[in-house]
Amino acid sequence: MFSHTNPLHQDVFKSVAQLEAEVVAMTAALLGSKEKASGGQICGNMTSGGTESILLAVKTSRDYMQSKKGITKPEMIIAESAHSAYDKAAQYFNIKVRRVPVNKEFLADVKGFKRCINGNTIMMVGSAPGFPHGLIDPIEELGELASQYGICLHVDLCLGGFVLPFARKLGYPIPPFDFSVKGVTSISTDVHKYGLAPKGTSTVLYRNHEIRKHQFVAVTEWTGGLYISPTMAGSRPGGLVAGAWAAMMSLGLNGYLESTGKIMEVSKKIQKGIDDISGLFVIGKPDMTVVAFGSDAVDIFEVNDIMSSKGWHLNALQRPNSLHICVTLQHTAIYEEFLKDLEDSVNTVKANPGPISGGMAPIYGAAGKMPDRGTVKELLVEFMDSSC
């Protein structure tokens, strides 16, 4: 029904523009827009995904801080656990990245962030949760720091935006993470993850319109007429906007509470199950539905190869070498099978250490040990360049 529509032309496709406004408003309401501390001006747009939302938040923060402080050599501070989309944004927008090691709990090190702040700092990033380990950074402390120094704070809720608000309602001990926290200036939240909307739907939100206006590109001297675009894309698929709206309206509060309850419960069971497997340990104290684990007894990447042969697709992590599972509704009926296969895989590696034929363990292991990261980067580029 909406496949022919284009939100770029709001005057033509008014119904799609209204749907986008409602998706943004509903998402903002989940993330503190109704709280007095938010300031009551939360605004935003839909994007094609978490990476675009992050790119826009970084670009907007850069331009906003340039207008406020005249910063021309911008820097941003991120934890080493922050998503790689921030590195992409830094490359796109000529921003220096100051990457801070995580603390012993694998969280953003607030003291380390503070040491990196200088006259060129435009923003800091906190994750809720971070993609690698499923841990929520200390957003309140980062907010205090951002307020103290007058810089932007972006909270990456791409993964947690449609889980944490409902987990909190269900009684889980979720630390503050949204616009109710003083100092938070922008938030990215994917609707196409736990919001269960079609792929290609995310949102980027701002504390007020003064900040958000720096996201837009307005052109007045084009012979084609006056032009303004809110996001990275010009034309956008209205069908995805409608799909996101339909998903949110169909599920509603009760639907999201039900799905969140199921995946949170299974996530805790998986966490305990991994802890009970000899030779494995869970990294940190997962706040949500991502459970990362490593091993001091076996090569965890060899375990991953065997799990892959059994049909499980886990993410391989580094520093430390580890794996993670991102629990979804599909896992709720088969988590016991997952834990059994994982224990069997660990025992297989214990009994027969060494890479399996065709496995990726040697590649992951070698890449992690190579001191020349430039060479590793070149290998990644060559791999991507060969794809098409």
Where are these regions (language model features)?
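Non-catalytic terminal extensions of PLP-dependent enzymes
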Residues: M1-A17, A21-A25, A29, K34-K36, ...
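Conserved beta-loop-alpha segment that forms the PLP phosphate-binding cup at the N-terminus of a helix
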Residues: E20, V24, G40-I71, A85-A89
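Short Gly/Ser/Thr- and Asp/Glu-enriched loop/turn motifs at secondary-structure junctions
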Residues: G39-Q41, I283-V290, Q318-S322
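Pyridoxal 5′-phosphate
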Residues: A57, N103-E105, N118, M124-V125, ...
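PLP-dependent aminotransferase-like
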Residues: M65-I122
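Active-site phosphate-binding strand-loop segment of PLP-dependent enzymes
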Residues: A108-H154
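Active-site C-terminal subdomain of aminotransferase-like
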Residues: Y149, H154, F166-T289, F293-V298, ...
